[in-house]
Amino acid sequence: MFTGLIEEMGEIVAIDPLGDSLRLTVRGPLVTGDAGHGDSIQVSGVCLTAIEFGAGGEGTFTADVMAQSIRMSTLGALRVGDKVNLERAARVDSRLGGHIVQGHVDGTAELLSATPGESWRVLRFSLDPALAPLLVDKGSVTLSGVSLTVSDVSEAAAEEPWFEVSLIPETLTATTLGLLAPGDRVNVETDILARHVARMLAFKNLTPSGEGATA
């Protein structure tokens, strides 16, 4: 589990194709400082398992990206030199400064517009119609690993759903969201509670009427 509070921006230093998967090597001196083999590190919102670390204090780690993660996220489009958001898995005694983030991406969204304010920026993204019911005004959403509050959403009947988030200066400078231009895509993870409610509602009329169920 993660909190969506990015610890550092890392850099892709190597990409090695492995059949239908990828092996990424990422530079992140902070997140690798106390990491060990098998630890979880979210890379721009995708939970990956660290399998190797650079020797001699290089501050790099290597992780495999499976075919499904490539299909569902932006990781397959990364190039050497690209910046990524990094966060270590939360501990039991961690402060939950953002919200519960699993690192399980639901899909991607395209940046439609970026409207600057005095010291902030409002970003509007497209949204897969299947995900639209899972986002609510003032609810939580994770974009490329960053925990954010939804500041506006399109009407329920909109043919092309969208949503907005407002970024403070700290988020603009400390994460890759400040580097985005219209047309760029981000990884989207909706709130876990919203996903569970939607799933239960889908089974509302199929639930057995008895007191228990047998498999």
Where do the language-model regions lie?
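Conserved loop->alpha-helix
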Residues: 1-215
